Amino acid sequence: MLDSFPERRNRNAMTALDPTARELLERAEFVAIVTQGPDGPHLVGNWGDYARRIGIDDERIIFPAGHYERTEQNLKRDSRIQLMAASRAVRGSRGPGQGGVIHGRGSVQAEGELASRAKAVFPWARGALVIEVERCEMQL
């Protein structure tokens, strides 16, 4: 289950997107997305440049939502979501390469301004996967 061990949280956890987390998202090729389903974690992914083309700000990340039916069902039951991204192009604390987990609350929006923005950039999208960032944990 997501966040089932809060005592294990990284001491370097920060609120919203700090400069390192933002740089990581700006350079990540692929982002893994985890939601909690009734039978355990559900893992999907998206291309990092898709979020960059729609929108990343200090509090929110937006991906185009194609299918994501199970992701949407999971988020309706439990809005917690985690993103994992990594890039060797970002300097880590111990050498080349940085990775991190972004924790937040998510929803799939099929209507509204954010869905329209996603559909304008990606005509195949049925809406937007919107992540409200709560905190980031850098790894590596």
Locate predicted features:
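Binding-site signature for planar aromatic cofactors or substrates
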Residues: M1-L140
